[in-house]
């Protein structure tokens, strides 16, 4: 994941990574609002991602396989919000021509710019990979048998997936220096880092849409009630086996031939029967999640493609596309925790009164969760 604007047609080696500090004085008044937006995203994203990491590390009920991938993404987003965004906000407020640090720190030919680009690339790449891991985890949780899910997401396998996401991101970041434009050199006709960024975003979008739309189809045709963002499965997982044991089906009387007719499956009790509104709400939640991803990433895809083929892209379009993508780093915790009752309880226990409003707003639409004792297994929320 690389910044396409770093390889744009601008040859200003001292400019900001997001072209917030161009040499043109006409942009001076427009850099301030963008810097203020980065400042707000930095503060909000740092607090939100830090809170999720703290809650998961402090409460054992939150230490599940799915939350491990969420925490991995929050750690990557925290590096973007706490380390990279403040630098962009400060650089955007500096006068034109003084976007880089003073002194000889950057005498090595854009080393500070490469450092910021590498930090951004590492954080965003791990974050996007974590979104894919969360989507794949949820897709397999619904579409595969519990035993298969447990085998795939053993603790060792989960740790390997997390380590692989960082190793892959680090490998991609190490490819940045050879492709960095040389000071005073003519810009190439094809910018491969920008094309690589566009290809990575398109691949991630395809995987997310496949997983989440597959979940929507499964929820629509299934009798199980699923809260997709919370992932409380009340069918197919052993919780329904416990319900079936509590409501056994009586065998039919033997027929004339002496053979007993096979027992017909007993319907689930009314408390476990899904309601159409709840299934529709789960589907809308997934579609909303997909829309957020598309809105945050697709503008950057087109900007990266245009920059990759040396097509002129207005500065405002570049800044807006990167702001949307970076906003995903700040909103990442809310995407996965806003309807999770365990997270709300944890927030209320740490900050009394803070989560009451969110709990009241979600009370009418929340899907009741089954405890681990009711599930009888750790398939839906395998602990680390």
UniProtKB/Swiss-Prot annotation:
Main location (coarse class): membrane
Q: In which tissues is it expressed?
A: Expressed predominantly in the striatum. Expressed also in olfactory tubercle, nucleus accumbens, amygdala, and neocortex. Spinal cord, pons, and medulla expression remains discrete. Also expressed in peripheral tissues, including adrenal cortex (16 dpc to 21 dpc) and cochlear ganglia (19 dpc to P3) and also at moderate levels in retina (18 dpc to 19 dpc) and spleen (21 dpc to P7).
Q: Which domain of life is it from?
A: Eukaryota
Cytoplasmic topological intervals: 57-73, 137-158, 217-285, 332-384
Q: Name one GO biological process term.
A: motor learning
Keyword flag Magnesium:
no
Give a Gene Ontology cellular component term annotated to this protein.
Answer: cilium
What role does it play?
Answer: Orphan G protein-coupled receptor implicated in a large repertoire of behavioral responses that engage motor activities, spatial learning, and emotional processing. May play a role in the regulation of cognitive and motor function. Couples with the heterotrimeric G protein complex of the G(i) subfamily, consisting of GNAI1, GNB1 and GNG2, thereby acting through a G(i)-mediated pathway. Plays a role in the attenuation of D1 dopamine receptor (D1R)-mediated cAMP response in ciliated cells. In non-ciliated cells, involved in the inhibition of the beta-2 adrenergic receptor (B2AR) response.
Spell out the protein name for this chain.
G protein-coupled receptor 88
What organism, scientifically named, is this protein from?
Rattus norvegicus
Q: Read off the lineage from the record.
A: Eukaryota, Metazoa, Chordata, Craniata, Vertebrata
